[in-house]
């Protein structure tokens, strides 16, 4: 298939782009799994193409962070001011330092990438029609050879399409209170700041460990804790947040439980997802939300950078005394604008 014609390809013509298992719908919600893909063969993910994309990417959708001190933990995660730096220089700084960049909602900026992902997911949905995706948000991740993303859990299901470089991912069991409590998971799913159990090396004994060379896709159960370390070279991945009918049912149960805990002081509401009572609980939650009876929580705090990009420095960044507020919309605002991706 012509790489230029990917936007016009049918699900059958796209079958060589990803080795998607037919039992994936069941596995997505129970166990991590890896399959191969061919996205790394596309020129749109080269340094030159990514630099051009960065040059025209809206500032409010581009986030850059550094792990400048090398300490393992979120206290070492610092936002970086990238404004006024060309895409070429930003990529050069990422190569030199310990940097992580995320281009959120890349589908709104690059029609080429949007067409590619639409083609790939047409094939995925052809193979697994019971995977009913409601909306999605693809983002490009570009990170340094020694960058890492610390122990955390996500509010939405995620697929990680690894395209360039090598990385190692640890995924941890979901229903383990020593890793993440039920209450913490409720706050994560609600989009509120939440302190998970601090990472300890002993957690790794319960983890699944996956080394990803280019051309591999990793999926793990929604909301399962995980962490990532890059192993070599500049890393490029496409991360795909999405909501399905199954994940929405689970999220609504946890959101309802959060409301029960907060307003009715129920200390440990049930996380059961199937049956008459869970269905009633979900309906009651949706009604209460529609009537404005539930507080939606605070918006993301302003994004303040205390470092700026400096491609000539050893770490790719330089201190920014006093800090500066950036125009980044924030995760919550970007999630709220999600629209159906598959028609």
Each model region followed by its residue ranges:
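A short beta-loop-beta micro-motif enriched in histidine and acidic residues
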Residues: 135, 148-158, 205-206
